[in-house]
């Protein structure tokens, strides 16, 4: 088990889909991020673990253009996140705590609405493809309010990937899901990973997080305390190691 932050946080920046350098975010006297740096190559899946208040959601908000950092930089697919360029918006998909779905619309109506926002060609075909990928084709004409929490989360991923983004951000996607819904969501994310999407996910679910990723980060008090390849992680003893890292 690696016991400290890997010093080579950006070994191959010239080939990286995501390049983050010394991101800092202050809220008055509170430092939510204090110098986060890392690279992520195309098709890699990074899971970020950390307690509440570690700065995980703040990091996701900055990387998706929803919040400006106090200092530092972030590049995604060659686009500067700080400029919030429309082209960058087309490269990313975001699943946050809110599903961003309209409960009184059907699944198909929801995706057709977003397809029009993205000015997609063949919007109905794209919407039906996304619904099928979520395993919800038999419920596509049902109002989203009738869906279970797990089904709504799968629909949220269908919404976030409708425009075929190259990078996907997920903030605590397994929260509130039962075992069946968790497994269905894992299958959906597995397919996206196979499809070479670059994925960053925050989660408290250690089992799911380790099972799906290529790289692991532990974040606390605004810093990455660990950033390592899953191949170098002692999976059987990770929970104990995780607790030790947070207590240092």
Summary of predicted features, one role per range:
Residues 168-171:
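Catalytic Walker B motif of ABC-type/P-loop ATPase nucleotide-binding domains
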Residues 112, 116-139:
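Conserved ABC ATPase "signature" region
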Residues 49-51:
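The feature captures the beta-strand-to-loop junction immediately N-terminal to the Walker
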Residues 203-204:
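H-loop/switch region of ABC-family ATPase nucleotide-binding domains
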Residues 72-80, 88:
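Conserved ABC transporter NBD signature motif
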Residues 64:
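Helix-to-loop junction immediately C-terminal to a conserved catalytic motif
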